[in-house]
């Protein structure tokens, strides 16, 4: 497959990650209940999840009585989601060009998906378009290291210290763009939403094994895995060693623990 754009990189990567992505869902699933809580009583609501992945949020919403529909551009993710949650409607779809009529849904959610899109502003506009008047769009992204995001800050610190970031990969949107106050205001207002609220969701990564932090990169990321694979063998081994040894600073009893809080934005049409 020819990888020419950031979208190509992400699409190809997530097609390959479907069977291993559950190594990170104990982390991402910590945001499910807070996301759904922004809609109040969801029983009977029609909610679209964009970038639905393995379908855990949709499955939780359906269990509470919502009419959930999940879309993802990775067919492998869609098939696994269908298998896990047969009572939910999952389909392949493009977040930047939703195949739904205007004002179709009461709610739209995007849990940690905006950072994987070529044109996230277009996706936010599409969410606004398919929402009914008074509907709500809620998204989550990772907080920056300065705002408590230890986990990804720690991993990238090891990569920067022992690797080379000047590599030949498609240009990517800024990873933390939608955790910035000015960028949030600009994107949400430009899409036409009438109001929004920002909050922080506590999320932590825990594991008994330091190697698990390295495995997260290879099994549950696309661009970070691509950065590592572009390194020399020696640099890659040095990065692995730095991650494993560096985790001792984050040991809590018999396990390792790092924070990676989520920034949650909930906007009303």
Task: Give, region by region, the residue ranges found by the protein language model.
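Conserved class I S-adenosyl-L-methionine
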Residues: 1-43, 56-60, 76-80, 84
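Conserved Class I S-adenosyl-L-methionine
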Residues: 3, 28, 54-56, 174-269
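Class I SAM-dependent methyltransferase SAM/SAH-binding core
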Residues: 46-98, 107, 122
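A short SAM/SAH-binding and catalytic strip from SAM-dependent methyltransferases
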Residues: 106-120, 143
């Amino acid at each position: 497959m020819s990888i020419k754009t950031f979208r190509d990189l992400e699409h190809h990567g997530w097609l390959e990650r479907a069977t291993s992505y559950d190594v990170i869902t104990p982390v991402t699933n910590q945001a499910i209940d807070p996301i759904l809580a922004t809609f109040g009583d969801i029983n009977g609501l029609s909610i679209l999840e964009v970038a639905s992945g393995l379908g855990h949020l949709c499955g939780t919403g359906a269990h509470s009585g919502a009419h959930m529909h999940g879309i993802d551009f990775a067919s492998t993710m869609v098939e696994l989601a269908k298998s896990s949650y047969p009572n939910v409607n999952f389909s392949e779809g493009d977040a930047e060009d939703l195949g739904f009529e205007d004002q179709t849904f009461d709610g739209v959610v995007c849990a940690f998906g905006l950072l994987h899109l070529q044109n996230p502003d277009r996706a936010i506009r599409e969410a606004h378009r398919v929402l009914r008047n008074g509907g709500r769009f809620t998204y989550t992204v990772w907080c920056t290291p300065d705002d408590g995001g230890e986990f990804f800050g720690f991993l990238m610190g090891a990569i920067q210290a022992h690797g080379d970031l000047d590599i030949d990969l498609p240009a990517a949107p800024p990873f933390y763009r939608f955790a910035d106050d000015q960028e949030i205001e600009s994107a949400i207002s430009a899409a036409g939403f009438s109001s929004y609220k920002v909050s922080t969701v506590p999320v932590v990564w825990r594991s008994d094994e330091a190697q698990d932090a390295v495995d997260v990169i290879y099994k549950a990321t696309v661009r970070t895995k691509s950065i590592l694979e572009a390194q020399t063998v020696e640099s890659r081994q040095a990065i692995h060693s730095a991650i494993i040894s560096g985790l001792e600073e984050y040991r809590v009893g018999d396990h390792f623990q790092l924070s990676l809080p989520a920034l949650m934005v909930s906007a009303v049409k």
